[in-house]
């Protein structure tokens, strides 16, 4: 194997080790550390782009490099770089903890890169646990110790339960097939998928990924974790973490071949409940991060629609949706971070007058929310369209109808946020927001990207289709 194809992981590991060594020194320079994190994350992204197209195995076949994993590693590296751009003012992370913050951020990204390329049950489990434990600590790092610790503990408790269920499922699959490698499982599983023990084992295994994706009933941690974590950490959980969850979920589901009837039915039920619970719960939220958390639960349901189609069109739709989620969610959180410049939580009503305080942020928020709602011509609309078409191709018309009803429901609470930003007046005169030129430029680029990917999605769709074919 060409070790250049493993360069993204090596660079990310080296970056984490560098910040770890830096944390052992007495002196701290937040600005230099932020610049270093930007440079290192950009270097990792460049390595991911340079290694696209490489193929091979390493670690005795336990880790696989193919186009599918490379595409997701590019998304993860891009997500890390985007999050680091928001970390110039980490007002809600104590200065003495900021180097540890970067250590955990790079370690978590490394774990998620390993997760999307894992080809062995052991690597899947270890990577998932490493990324999860990094996130538990990141959530608890918030300056408001009570709120952050409470959220971190809730996140941890749900996580260890999901991990226990998952490892039992892995044991069932290994016992039924005698194989622990995913590519070997892909050859054996289609022939035994109709056995009840195999279906149960696969569902229990998937529950670990459902936890990461915030699928019902593994979503209870999400609202509290989003609300209790620092805003940059919440943004990271909502973007990079979800990209990794979609990647490993699609890889494992693809190993099941055409799948079993029971598996499809269970995934359909989880999809419907996730969409419905997420959207209905979001309507009642006044805290913007809790609203976005329940929105994430609903989007997990949309992703499952593509996955349960169990065909190349469904898998490629899920890959496209991962890209769309990364851009849409990050843009919404960028606005949140800039408006709540003191690092505190942001209520929807506090967006009043945003169109005057910062027109570019108001525009970015509006486009991101319209995209999350699936309004054309945005990347969110294209993502939902691809997912729905894949499902209808397999005859899941009722499921698509329920999803479309949920899209209408979601539009209501997204419009409430847009109404606050454009139509409500603040109770007192507020000064204009001071947004740095680089972040203004980034906001404009993201707006253009969301609209351009809606108008001209063909290139991204082709990449997603090629990535999906690498699984088959």
From Swiss-Prot:
One of its GO terms (cellular component) is plasma membrane. It catalyses: a quinone + NADH + 5 H(+)(in) = a quinol + NAD(+) + 4 H(+)(out). Keywords: Cell inner membrane, Cell membrane, Membrane, NAD, Quinone, Translocase, Transmembrane, Transmembrane helix, Transport, Ubiquinone. It is a multi-pass membrane protein. One of its GO terms (biological process) is ATP synthesis coupled electron transport. It is an enzyme of class 7 (translocase). Pfam families: Proton_antipo_M (PF00361). GO terms for molecular function: NADH dehydrogenase (ubiquinone) activity; NADH:ubiquinone reductase (non-electrogenic) activity; quinone binding. Its EC number is 7.1.1.-. It is found in: Cell inner membrane. The keyword Coiled coil does not apply. The keyword Cell membrane applies. NDH-1 is composed of 14 different subunits. Subunits NuoA, H, J, K, L, M, N constitute the membrane sector of the complex. Belongs to the complex I subunit 2 family. This is NADH-quinone oxidoreductase subunit N 2. It comes from Syntrophobacter fumaroxidans (strain DSM 10017 / MPOB).
